[in-house]
């Protein structure tokens, strides 16, 4: 299929793109599943308390079962004693399994989200950036001109290195390369911006 391509002067052209990425089936259930797994795997479960079986110390009873008049107790490792284990406390990162995210799931979810952006006219493709953008002021004027104030800009690695600094202080705009964006990024921003080179890399990676 063909979609519009713009240059920085605003002139319109077209570019041939893969249907399987830009006109894919929108699978919202799959996207939700990918987001759930990604979010679960991002969580840093650093809090950890010792369970009763992890406490170092004697396992002998603290006093006899009968004859003391007190309640029955086993060892001092019990959660009711100071220095004992913690009942139902956080178990730390190793106790939780990472949810497996298949490559095919990731590819199909990205294709679904890009297709949705395309259908909503929130997908913009530019010709490759040369050395036109060197300052934040220049980048800001381009963002304002093309109404991409809330956008994820996905570039090839060399282009990203050129303009990354010029975008750093502009709010609600993120610049990344083709290897470092996720379904979360696409959903977070209203518009997604590609260049001709990043489209080619995307098609190699996700086709």
Curated annotation (Swiss-Prot):
InterPro entries listed in its UniProt record: Ribosomal_uL4, Ribosomal_uL4-like, Ribosomal_uL4_dom_sf
GO biological process: translation
SUPFAM superfamilies xref list: Ribosomal protein L4 (SSF52166)
Keyword Nucleus included in the entry's annotation: no
Domain of life: Bacteria
A cellular-component GO term for this protein: ribonucleoprotein complex
GO molecular function: rRNA binding; structural constituent of ribosome
Keyword terms, alphabetized: Ribonucleoprotein, Ribosomal protein, RNA-binding, rRNA-binding
Gene3D superfamilies: 3.40.1370.10
Family statement: Belongs to the universal ribosomal protein uL4 family.
Complex formation: Part of the 50S ribosomal subunit.
Function: One of the primary rRNA binding proteins, this protein initially binds near the 5'-end of the 23S rRNA. It is important during the early stages of 50S assembly. It makes multiple contacts with different domains of the 23S rRNA in the assembled 50S subunit and ribosome.
The protein's name in its UniProt record: Large ribosomal subunit protein uL4
Organism, scientific name: Pelagibacter ubique (strain HTCC1062)
Lineage, top ranks: Bacteria, Pseudomonadati, Pseudomonadota, Alphaproteobacteria, Candidatus Pelagibacterales
Gene that this sequence comes from: rplD
